Amino acid sequence: MSGQGKRLMVMAGGTGGHVFPGLAVAHHLMAQGWQVRWLGTADRMEADLVPKHGIEIDFIRISGLRGKGIKALIAAPLRIFNAWRQARAIMKAYKPDVVLGMGGYVSGPGGLAAWSLGIPVVLHEQNGIAGLTNKWLAKIATKVMQAFPGAFPNAEVVGNPVRTDVLALPLPQQRLAGREGPVRVLVVGGSQGARILNQTMPQVAAKLGDSVTIWHQSGKSSQQSVEQAYAEAGQPQHKVTEFIDDMAAAYAWADVVVCRSGALTVSEIAAAGLPALFVPFQHKDRQQYWNALPLEKAGAAKIIEQPQLSVDAVANTLAGWSRETLLTMAERARAASIPDATERVANEVSRAARA
């Protein structure tokens, strides 16, 4: 499907969970001849990341309202109005055929600006429970899609766009069937790490002994303290890295993952075909719990919520999974994934632009 001459503006910012799926869709459409620009904020990760992908970015000034003081809330309508004016001026100059909102504060003023100019607004909700911005924008959107069922009652479930190197991994049967020796446990707390996993997993390693080998992503500035915790637990042999650049290689190595359940992490683990022990971040709306629930229901994962997390709970869960069980869970994870999510989102963007 050629997009020659068509123009898309992607609105996404703040976290990798919003930005990376947006980049996947942008690259897919650029390969079809689309022109793509990005709407973001200058002080968040998209400011550095998006230009590295060969995409020009425009900035508006906007930030979140949750947890702000009364003065900030009083000033909020004016700030939103100014951000809307900035976004509207950018869109009047660029003249996109369609805008794609992938979440983050920038999507709010951007979506309203597009709607006020008669530009179709397509939304994608990455999480199992809808964010505030997308809840508002859904009322004016041309099309609403969701990664997991339940965020919106009638929205199409299309999955989350994930990186092509993860999608290219061999299927679980090819990867895991012949494996022997200690079970390979990948511990991931997101790019910032997760203090609770950094504190718990060295003690889990001590309980499980030689039955596991662990690769632990500690997050920024925590590598030394986590290595020390493993050494003090009598388990210095395990690998601790601050950040994992090649997640596809880490998934290929692993037999099971112990991790938080951010939307992109859950979708990548399903696409890779891996069993998981999820420890959702304790957010007010339990967003990460709802992200992980479909894989637990599919028999591909177990959720331990943070108040119930203990060394024994993790150790007993991992010890209870034989290699045969892990392979069955891995196959269920892969079966629950939506590997063509990028294409599905891109197709809806194309349809909205032609309507």
UniProtKB/Swiss-Prot annotation:
Catalytic activity: di-trans,octa-cis-undecaprenyl diphospho-N-acetyl-alpha-D-muramoyl-L-alanyl-D-glutamyl-meso-2,6-diaminopimeloyl-D-alanyl-D-alanine + UDP-N-acetyl-alpha-D-glucosamine = di-trans,octa-cis-undecaprenyl diphospho-[N-acetyl-alpha-D-glucosaminyl-(1->4)]-N-acetyl-alpha-D-muramoyl-L-alanyl-D-glutamyl-meso-2,6-diaminopimeloyl-D-alanyl-D-alanine + UDP + H(+)
Entry-linked CDD domains: GT28_MurG
GO terms under biological process: carbohydrate metabolic process; cell division; cell wall organization; lipid glycosylation; peptidoglycan biosynthetic process; regulation of cell shape
Keywords tagged on the record: Cell cycle, Cell division, Cell inner membrane, Cell membrane, Cell shape, Cell wall biogenesis/degradation, Glycosyltransferase, Membrane, Peptidoglycan synthesis, Transferase
Subcellular location: Cell inner membrane
GO cellular component: plasma membrane
Disulfide bonds: none
Pathway: Cell wall biogenesis; peptidoglycan biosynthesis
Pfam families: Glyco_tran_28_C, Glyco_transf_28
Record membrane topology: Peripheral membrane protein
Residues binding UDP-N-acetyl-alpha-D-glucosamine, per UniProt: 15-17, 127, 163, 191, 244, 263-268, 288
E.C. numbers: 2.4.1.227
Record-level Gene Ontology MF annotations: UDP-N-acetyl-D-glucosamine:N-acetylmuramoyl-L-alanyl-D-glutamyl-meso-2,6-diaminopimelyl-D-alanyl-D-alanine-diphosphoundecaprenol 4-beta-N-acetylglucosaminlytransferase activity; undecaprenyldiphospho-muramoylpentapeptide beta-N-acetylglucosaminyltransferase activity
Keyword Cell division recorded: yes
UniProt-listed InterPro entries: GlcNAc_MurG, Glyco_trans_28_C, GlycoTrans_28_N
Main location: membrane
Family under the similarity heading: Belongs to the glycosyltransferase 28 family. MurG subfamily.
Free-text function comment from the UniProt entry: Cell wall formation. Catalyzes the transfer of a GlcNAc subunit on undecaprenyl-pyrophosphoryl-MurNAc-pentapeptide (lipid intermediate I) to form undecaprenyl-pyrophosphoryl-MurNAc-(pentapeptide)GlcNAc (lipid intermediate II).
Entries under NCBIfam families matching the protein: murG (TIGR01133)
Name of protein: UDP-N-acetylglucosamine--N-acetylmuramyl-(pentapeptide) pyrophosphoryl-undecaprenol N-acetylglucosamine transferase
Lineage: Bacteria, Pseudomonadati, Pseudomonadota, Gammaproteobacteria, Enterobacterales
